[in-house]
Regions:
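Middle-to-C-terminal accessory/interaction subdomains
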Residues: 1-43
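A short linear-motif detector with a strong N-terminal bias
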Residues: 4-5, 11-13, 64, 114-116, ...
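A short, polar beta-strand/turn micro-motif
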Residues: 42-100, 122-193, 198-226
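Phosphate-backbone binding interfaces of nucleic-acid-interacting proteins
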Residues: 105
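C-terminal outer-membrane/trafficking sorting elements
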Residues: 110-113, 227
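Conserved SET/PR domain catalytic loop and adjacent active-site segment
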Residues: 112-115, 132
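Short linear interaction motifs
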Residues: 115-123
Length: 227
């Protein structure tokens, strides 16, 4: 209690013995629930909701801690297609394969090739993912949201990073983020289509988008050579 021994807060009633008795009863009456609770405790599962606009602040207490992280509301990653992804923890090659499957490709933004009004976004293969850095990921098969479980990762809840190349920015998101409606934001959609965002919108966390200056001549963006 506050104030030390012998200085209990006025009006405070100690229910600790009653609570202990209830816990003991429930443990004996429902042993399977007790086992499940202990399993969850040992896993230290953190359900990271990418729809939250304050995800970084909400999970600040877990910053620097090792947890099993489930991405909630991230939606599936599509097999055979590029998916923009940004995570609040590092992944080595083994961890990438464990979640996204054998044959998965991961690439980092490296440059732009301009051909008049058509801009080609170029990427370089990588074997590890760093926290807060945006990447594109192509699994062989669909990866369901329920499979986005990352075991024993160390959370680093700094702001997502911006990778700038040749006047273009690849911007990661770790929480729900507003996108400008001025035509400078481009989002990677299904079938590797990069679409210009012309209306105000919000992009969920653990994704990424591109910013092309309004002064550029870009009328279309595409993912460059995959080799």
């Amino acid at each position: 209690t506050e104030g030390g021994a012998g200085h209990e807060k006025e009006g405070f009633t100690d229910y600790s013995e009653t609570i202990t008795a209830i816990k003991t009863y429930l443990k004996n009456r429902f042993p399977y629930l007790d086992a499940k609770f202990r399993e969850l405790q040992s896993d230290r599962v953190l359900r990271y909701n990418v729809e939250k606009t304050d995800a970084l602040a909400a999970w600040a207490m877990s910053d620097g801690k090792t947890r099993t992280v489930l991405l909630k509301n991230r939606k599936d990653l599509h097999g055979g297609e590029w998916n923009a992804l940004c995570l609040p923890f590092d992944l080595d090659e083994a961890a990438i394969t464990a979640v996204f499957g054998q044959g998965v490709q991961v690439k980092a933004f490296s440059s732009i090739t301009r051909n008049g009004e058509n801009f080609s976004l170029n990427f370089t293969p990588v074997t590890r993912m760093e926290h807060g850095v945006p990447y594109i990921v192509k699994p062989v098969a669909d990866v369901a949201e329920a499979s986005l479980r990352f075991a024993d990762v160390t959370l680093n809840l700094e702001d997502a990073q911006i990778v700038a190349r040749d006047g273009c920015q690849f911007v990661g998101t770790l929480q729900k983020t507003p996108l400008a409606s001025d035509g400078t934001c481009w989002v990677l959609m299904r079938n590797n289509v990069v679409k210009r965002q012309m209306a105000a919108a919000q992009l969920h966390g653990c994704r990424a988008y591109f910013i092309i200056p309004a002064t550029s001549e870009a009328q279309s963006l595409s993912i460059g050579d995959e080799t």
